[in-house]
Amino acid sequence: DFTVAYQRSSGDTGYNYGFYQNQGAVGDGGTTIWVANSFWSDFNAEDERSWQFGYGHDFTQYGIPGLSYNFAYIYGTDINVGGPESGSEREIFNQLKYVVQSGAAKDMSIRLRSSFLRVSNNASAYNDDGNEVRIFVDFPMHIL
């Protein structure tokens, strides 16, 4: 499956989750957030526009039910940094996931996720460069 997404943030600040960095105010979008391009970075700085190109694959057809892979490249531009040039950021996201198909651990999933984020120097007050690798283990509990 292929994904193409566009997202635009507008207002007096980026989306601040209660407070945006040190700006201390809720932007004109209120307190609701629905973002298409949210991985490590949410790509929601002041005036930011972002594009995502992604790909996901289910390996069931290759005889490995429960295994999937997702990739995304997200590029954000037009970050208002209060100067003559706008800032930018980009992220590469990878995730490998396996869901146990049967037995006592049925529906348990293990995800290996990596992200590589790069932010232009003039937007460093908004976000920082970084690399991360995370492992998630989700074990659903069926109570009722």
Describe each model-derived feature in a short phrase:
Residues D1-P65:
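Extracellular/periplasmic loop regions
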Residues G66-Q95:
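C-terminal/domain-terminus segments
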